[in-house]
């Protein structure tokens, strides 16, 4: 049976990563497996920033956002020679497998290690909810609640001043956060990269809302679709109503994780340990229909595509 495993977090931090780290460590220790934490992601793996962790190492972290292990961008990990040096560090400590918590860039690193014969398990840790093979990623629910609270606050002031608010949220090229926030926050309009938008159609919809007696409007938009300040200016010129853009930015990544994210991270962390005990390497874990599943990590990255949530998108159109 496997005797030593490592765990690292990589890429952008997400609330619930600490809960996942805690789960991996305590589930492994409960089954007699030693656990080593790698600080600062793949950079720390290459620089040998590796330490043995115990149960007390993860006391009082389940409620904390961010990641106790730290994270870092490390483009040089794409180079095979760099990865070989990283594997040499793992072998030096006797670490037989690695649990990687992060987004698609982190998965790519785990895929590369897997292709070199080193077993890895990927856990989806990103607020963007853009990982194939899972309905939800660790951190998405917490970020959604942060965005929803921001929309609630903006609605208060927008109603008071008969103002239109354009709210930019994270998500990179995935509109899940913008759509879920639109439904949960009661936004009038949502703009996502999967669907794009025509400015004339948006303006016509806003005109329709004003004609029906609406005193304000909330528009949620995924980052990178368009310049939100320019869009706000366009809307204000067209309608004559004060329009302001709010870019929520990195506030969406921080804060104490929700109960849903803590439970999801805990389930996935323990499941990763079970898979490694079974001799399963090169896998990534997901949650589908509330059941834990695992996929081949190479197949997940190369062939699986995350489906667009048409139901949620259509709901935003009905409920505005």
Swiss-Prot record:
It catalyses: beta-D-fructose 6-phosphate + ATP = beta-D-fructose 1,6-bisphosphate + ADP + H(+). Pathway: Carbohydrate degradation; glycolysis; D-glyceraldehyde 3-phosphate and glycerone phosphate from D-glucose: step 3/4. The keyword Magnesium applies. ATP binds at residues 12, 73-74, 103-106. Belongs to the phosphofructokinase type A (PFKA) family. ATP-dependent PFK group I subfamily. Prokaryotic clade 'B1' sub-subfamily. Allosterically activated by ADP and other diphosphonucleosides, and allosterically inhibited by phosphoenolpyruvate. Gene3D superfamilies: 3.40.50.450, Phosphofructokinase domain (3.40.50.460). Its EC number is 2.7.1.11. GO terms for molecular function: 6-phosphofructokinase activity; AMP binding; ATP binding; fructose-6-phosphate binding; identical protein binding; metal ion binding; monosaccharide binding. Keywords: Allosteric enzyme, ATP-binding, Cytoplasm, Glycolysis, Kinase, Magnesium, Metal-binding, Nucleotide-binding, Transferase. Transmembrane segments: none annotated. GO terms for biological process: canonical glycolysis; fructose 1,6-bisphosphate metabolic process; fructose 6-phosphate metabolic process. This is ATP-dependent 6-phosphofructokinase. It holds the Pfam family PFK. InterPro entries: ATP_PFK, ATP_PFK_prok-type, PFKA_ATP_prok, Phosphofructokinase_CS, Phosphofructokinase_dom, PKF_sf. Mg(2+) binds at residue 104. The gene is pfkA. Its cofactor is Mg(2+). Homotetramer. Substrate binds at residues 126-128, 163, 170-172, 223, 244, 250-253. It comes from the Bacteria. Catalyzes the phosphorylation of D-fructose 6-phosphate to fructose 1,6-bisphosphate by ATP, the first committing step of glycolysis. Its main location: cytoplasm. SUPFAM superfamilies: Phosphofructokinase. It is found in: Cytoplasm. GO terms for cellular component: 6-phosphofructokinase complex. ADP binds at residues 22-26, 155, 186-188, 214-216.
């Amino acid at each position: 049976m496997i005797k030593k495993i490592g765990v690292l977090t990589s890429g952008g931090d997400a609330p619930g990563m600490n809960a996942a780290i805690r789960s991996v460590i305590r589930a492994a220790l409960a089954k007699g497996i030693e656990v080593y934490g790698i600080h600062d992601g793949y950079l720390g793996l290459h620089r040998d920033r590796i330490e043995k962790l115990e149960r007390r190492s993860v006391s009082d972290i389940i409620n904390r956002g961010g990641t106790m292990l730290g994270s870092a961008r490390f483009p040089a990990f794409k180079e095979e020679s760099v990865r070989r040096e990283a594997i040499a560090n793992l072998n030096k400590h006797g670490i037989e497998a690695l649990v990687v918590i992060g987004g698609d860039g982190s998965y790519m690193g785990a895929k590369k290690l897997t292709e070199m014969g080193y077993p890895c398990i990927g856990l989806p840790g990103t607020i963007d909810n853009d990982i194939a093979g899972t309905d939800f990623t660790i951190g998405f629910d917490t970020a959604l609640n942060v965005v929803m609270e921001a929309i609630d606050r903006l609605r208060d002031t927008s109603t008071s001043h008969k103002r239109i608010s354009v709210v930019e949220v994270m998500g990179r090229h995935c509109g899940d956060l913008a759509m879920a926030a639109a439904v949960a926050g009661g936004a009038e309009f949502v703009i996502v990269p999967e669907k794009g938008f025509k400015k004339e159609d948006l303006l016509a919809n806003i005109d329709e809302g004003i004609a029906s007696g609406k005193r304000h409007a909330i528009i949620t938009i995924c980052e990178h679709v368009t310049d939100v300040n320019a869009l706000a200016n366009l809307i204000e010129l067209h309608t004559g109503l004060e329009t302001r853009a709010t870019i929520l930015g990195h506030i969406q990544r921080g804060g104490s994780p929700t109960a849903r994210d803590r439970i999801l991270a805990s389930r996935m962390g323990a499941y990763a340990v079970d898979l490694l005990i079974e001799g399963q390497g090169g896998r990534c874990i997901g949650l589908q229909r509330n059941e834990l599943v695992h996929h081949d990590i190479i197949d997940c990255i190369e062939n699986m595509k995350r489906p667009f949530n048409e139901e949620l998108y259509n709901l935003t159109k009905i409920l505005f």
